[in-house]
Swiss-Prot record:
Part of the viral DNA-directed RNA polymerase that consists of 8 polII-like subunits (RPB1, RPB2, RPB3, RPB5, RPB6, RPB7, RPB9, RPB10), a capping enzyme and a termination factor. In the N-terminal section; belongs to the archaeal RpoD/eukaryotic RPB3 RNA polymerase subunit family. In the C-terminal section; belongs to the archaeal RpoL/eukaryotic RPB11/RPC19 RNA polymerase subunit family. Keywords: DNA-directed RNA polymerase, Early protein, Host cytoplasm, Transcription, Viral transcription, Virion. It comes from the Viruses. Component of the DNA-directed RNA polymerase (RNAP) that catalyzes the transcription in the cytoplasm of viral DNA into RNA using the four ribonucleoside triphosphates as substrates. Pfam families: RNA_pol_L_2. GO terms for biological process: DNA-templated transcription; viral transcription. This is DNA-directed RNA polymerase RPB3-11 homolog. GO terms for molecular function: protein dimerization activity. It comes from African swine fever virus (isolate Pig/Kenya/KEN-50/1950). It is found in: Host cytoplasm; Virion. GO terms for cellular component: DNA-directed RNA polymerase complex; host cell cytoplasm; virion component. Induction: Expressed in the early phase of the viral replicative cycle.
Amino acid sequence: MEKIFQNVDIKPLLIDFSNPFIKNAAKKLFQLEEQLPLVPVNVMMDFKGINRATVHGLSRVLQDEIPNYMLDIKPGGYKIEDSTDLFMTEQFVRNRINFIPIYAENETLVFALRSLNNSCEVKTIYSRDLIQVAGPKLKYPIFNPTFEIGFLQPGKSLIIEDIYIKKGIGRKHAAFNLAVKTHFSHLDIEQYPTDKKEYMALSGYKQSSMTSDPRHHRLGLCFPAVPLPRINQVVRTYLKNACRVIIGRIQNIQKIYENFEEPQPELVLFSMDEEKTKAIITIKDETHTIGNLLKTCIYEMIPDISFVGYQCIPHKQEMVLTIIHKASQEDLITLLEKSIQNIIQIFQTLEKNIDERIA
């Protein structure tokens, strides 16, 4: 298989200390003389030879379907009796803490916030005011000191214990999002000039991406908190992890039909007539991301297939894949296996290309 990962552009968003206004503001507010330990990183990638659903799947997984970390407050951690500023409610402060971008590798660290305003002015509480109270000594900070957590009126206090690191995925809570601002476009579909798009209310492409079958794509995204000394290493790890997550989820589907001769509640196979076979596969806790990827890749591998579609059932937390084809049960399973293997091969190749492209 040819190289899928054609090009990558990695750009950290650094503070422009050459600008006197920015330099003075950074020094006055945060006593900064150098770059912050964590920086947002924009990544632009070009892919070739894969379908639209593959890029969409990678985009969705990188954004909100891959495990990541956030800061949260344990029940009882917000000390109401010791926090005297009525404007700083638990929910207000919790949301601010949740959405501090962090770079964490485990869940062993615990922080606290113990702030008292002894001045005559309103005091702004920043993430730098969080103190570590448990866990191993940090070699590098896991968050920047510049995020606003709350505000204290003169003479008031805010006490929070047990601020811990929580693991989850972005589709359950947006604070877990690994990447943000994900977007992709197709480079092999002719587009309208910018001036025409403005007054003709056009989408941009002269042909629908749903019918033109684009094979050359550009995916852009931003990782909001990457350690400055290890930008390439971290970006490479994130991209490879996304490929492995997709491979793992596809392999879970593979396990359902491996022994299809034995009765399995997740797999239903029956003959509709003498020629057609219908397969219904139920996949637990799966999303449109994998459904769309499977549907597209099965159509590509079996162009004359009668039907392939999927339905996500949120209240059951499952996805149901339906396939109808002019084949025996054994032949249908064989064709499905080839489609699954093709998806796995694509993401294994992509993972290898990432290693080659990002040093």
